[in-house]
Regions:
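N-terminal leader/linker segments that initiate helical-solenoid repeat arrays
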Residues: 36-83, 87, 96, 110, ...
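Short solvent-exposed coil/turn linkers within tandem alpha-helical repeat scaffolds
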Residues: 65-74, 98-109, 132-145, 169-179, ...
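Catalytic glycan-binding domains that act on GlcNAc-containing polysaccharides
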Residues: 319-324, 330, 344-361, 366, ...
């Protein structure tokens, strides 16, 4: 979604305001792609791609010059300027601009759609519906969106009968909570209260955190309309969604409503509600209330009682009270054998022993876990950590046995590459010189952390690693044109690169072969849709990229969007642009409008509070959360942050760990584990997510450098520096 820099001068209210945010997808649609659009300057293209605040003024200036000279690109520039006014929240000005120039036939539906948006935001719903309906016959993606918006506009105009068939048509094509809410509203207006209730029920169960569900719930509670009847299981399902998203207060309110509505009728239900209530209280730092709730849960059925004890054990771990936590875990293992919680308790007993340096105890506990829980999905992890305990303990034979068992028993596990690397590493630690084995790792897994480690181990042994990728990634100039891409290409040549990307993405599901993926992915990349090209390549082009070393496939898997700005920003902050791209690849897969479940936003997945803290350090106004979707702002703030992390932590593995888990946690780990070599340090970090994150970011950092950097490759330091005592702390 393209963020607006400020609200519309005529701000829509209620549901219309929600639709304003949902409908801004057109905001920066009219951006030229390369030489196909000759009316816009390269400077304007860059500004629009990065969503710079100056893009509107630049577009208006170029339009004025074009109009004065009578150039042919005035209609395209007018549409661009109008769309930018719309995204800035100035619908009246946008309407004036959009009506100044007719559009060529191909662009007419997109101009009509933008005019419809402008009318909608100034609350002229009948005019909006008429404009949207002019776009409903267009070929491609815009037609479905126009149908949806026409239905919503007619609904706002009081024409529920005309709106309903359009909304139903759009719901079938697009789905989503907004259209469910609109259909419920239309059905209610037409007297179909049962249908409206069914839609609201689906909305609240399937999309509990959507703004549409939140608004509908609030409106129902504030009116005389009958509330949506949810079962206890549905209420508890919603509660878990809110807890997972960090909305503990909302979760508590949901539990309160379960009790108020008389859904909690037996001891088992009371125990389930109490267990969830305890988790919400802990999240709100209300420990005393949480303990009271856990006492109720502990008196419930065995499965709930075991989960309650597990929640208490996790809380003790968070407080670093490991001895008490271990006692609780041991009690779960003995008292509740066979319950799901006992599996997690047994696993954590082995894992905690490893974290505390009780290496032989850890190895024995983890091997026991594999035997005790033969159906567990964690058996491969337990096997690897058993091997890790033996490696740290210097028991090379036992380490090799565990690693061999991992390869043999769990051959389809994603831990096999690291098992193979560590078997070779164990051979070296035992006194061998496994040059050929390391070279095999490099050939098998060239794009991974373990391929990078194998390179460095070869150099450590005095060997020169054979180059794996011999050709720089580049988009193919030999990709054949495809008939199915005729419309996207025509849109791109008209300057509608975002719409071209929409059309290309709509075709992704029909791409099933590497050859087609290369053709469509290249077209995506050429119109600036790096994230869509990457996702397609990630699904179908691994063989071409890593087995065949095809530079065209590698270019799609390792793109460099916004390259001039990324390079400039990286230089300003004293970091390698390769590191920024590696973080971007992991965080958002190059998707500028990505929003995570934790509410992190944009290319580098910045949290609003982190962005505000960075802005304060830079003496800038804190950005609105939705402003973080702007690539330029997101990159500027995150590059400064990465630069500060680099000053404090130096090593890319530590920088990546701090970006993911935070500086304080990373400092704690370096204090406890920092004497280890980097491979062992990364495997020993307590957070599973951070281990995976660091491995990918470090590998991608060095691959980007090898692909696009200078002639001399950077080396990965195998020992970790001591972090600076002072530096960034958030």
């Amino acid at each position: 979604m393209v963020p607006a820099s400020r609200g519309p001068r005529t701000r829509p209210r209620g549901r219309a305001r929600r639709l304003f945010h949902a409908g801004r997808w057109l905001a920066l649609c009219v951006v030229a792609a390369g030489p196909a659009a000759r009316g816009q300057s390269e400077r304007l293209l860059e500004a629009t791609r990065l969503q710079r605040a100056s893009a509107l003024e630049m577009a208006q200036a170029e339009l004025a010059t074009c109009t004065r000279k009578g150039c042919a690109q005035a209609p395209q520039l007018s549409l661009l300027a109008g769309s930018l006014l719309l995204s800035r929240g100035e619908p009246r000005e946008a309407l004036v601009q959009l009506r100044k120039h007719p559009a060529p036939p191909l662009l007419a539906p997109y101009r009509s759609f933008a005019i419809g948006q402008a009318y909608f935001y100034i609350r002229d719903f009948r005019a909006a519906a008429q404009a949207f309906q002019e776009a409903t016959t267009a070929p491609g993606v815009v037609a479905n969106r126009a149908v949806a918006r026409a239905g919503e506009a007619l609904l706002r105009a009081g024409e529920a009968g005309q709106a309903l068939p359009l909304i139903e048509r759009a719901l079938g094509a697009l789905g989503g909570p907004e259209l469910l809410s609109a259909r419920a509203e239309a059905r209610a207006a037409l007297g179909d209260l049962g249908g409206a209730q069914a839609d609201l029920h689906t909305l609240m169960v399937r999309y509990p955190r959507s703004q549409a569900a939140i608004d509908a719930d609030a409106e129902l509670r504030g009116s005389s309309a009958p509330a949506v009847a949810l079962t206890l299981d549905e209420r508890l399902q919603r509660t878990r969604v809110f807890l997972d998203a960090g909305d503990a207060k909302v979760a508590l309110a949901e539990l309160d409503r379960s009790e108020t509505n008389g859904l909690v009728r037996d001891p088992g239900a009371r125990a389930q509600v109490a267990l969830l209530r305890a988790q919400a209280f802990f999240a709100l730092n209300r420990a005393e209330d949480a303990e009271d709730a856990l006492a109720v849960a502990a008196a419930g059925p065995p499965a709930t009682a075991a989960e309650a004890m597990l929640v208490r054990a996790r809380r003790l771990l968070k407080l670093d009270e490991h001895t008490k936590a271990i006692e609780r875990l041991q009690e779960i293992s003995k008292k509740f054998a066979g319950e799901p919680a006992s599996e997690e308790a047994d696993y954590f007993l082995g894992w905690l022993a490893l974290q505390e340096g009780k290496l032989q105890v850890a190895a024995e506990a983890l091997e026991s876990f594999e035997k005790k829980h033969p159906e567990s999905r964690r058996r491969d992890e337990a096997c690897f950590f058993r091997a890790l305990a033996q490696i740290r303990n210097g028991n090379w034979a036992e380490a090799d046995r565990a690693l061999r068992e991992l390869q043999d028993r769990y051959s389809r596990s994603n831990l096999v590459p690291q098992a193979k690397y560590w078997r070779v590493r164990v051979k070296q630690l035992a006194g061998g010189k496994p040059l050929d084995d390391y070279q095999d790792i490099l050939k098998l897994y060239p794009q991974t952390f373990y391929g990078l480690l194998a390179q460095e181990r070869l150099r450590e042994l005095g060997a020169k690693p054979e180059p794996i990728f011999t050709e720089r990634p580049h988009l193919s100039s030999k990709v054949a044109a495809a008939p199915e891409l005729a419309l996207p290409r025509a849109l791109a040549s008209a300057g509608l690169w975002r719409e071209s990307g929409e059309e290309l993405r709509a075709r992704l599901g029909a791409v099933h072969t590497p050859e087609a993926a290369l053709r469509v992915g290249t077209a995506l990349a050429r119109v600036g849709e790096a994230w869509a090209a990457y996702h397609l390549a990630n699904r179908l082009l691994w063989g071409k990229a890593y087995a065949q070393k095809d530079p065209a496939a590698l270019a799609l898997l390792y793109p460099r969007p916004y390259v001039s700005h990324v390079d400039e920003t990286a230089r300003a902050q004293g970091v390698h642009s390769s590191l920024l791209y590696a973080i971007m690849r992991r965080e958002s897969a190059f998707q500028p409008d990505r929003l995570s479940a934790a509410r992190a936003r944009g290319l580098m997945q910045l949290m609003a509070r982190t962005a505000s803290a960075i802005a304060r350090e830079l003496q800038r106004d804190p950005p609105e959360p939705d402003e973080l979707y702007r690539p330029e702002l997101n990159l500027d703030l995150s590059a400064w942050y990465v630069g500060q992390l680099a000053k404090r932590f130096v090593h890319p593995a530590l920088i990546a760990a701090a970006y993911n888990a935070g500086p304080a946690v990373t400092l704690k780990w370096t204090g406890e584990l920092g004497s280890m070599p980097v491979d062992l340090f990364v495997e020993s970090m307590p957070f599973k997510e951070t281990r995976a994150y660091v491995k990918q970011v470090v590998a991608d950092d060095y691959l980007y450098q090898a692909f696009y950097g200078g002639a001399e490759a950077r080396r990965l330091a195998m020992t970790l520096p001591k972090p600076a005592s002072n530096g960034i702390e958030f």
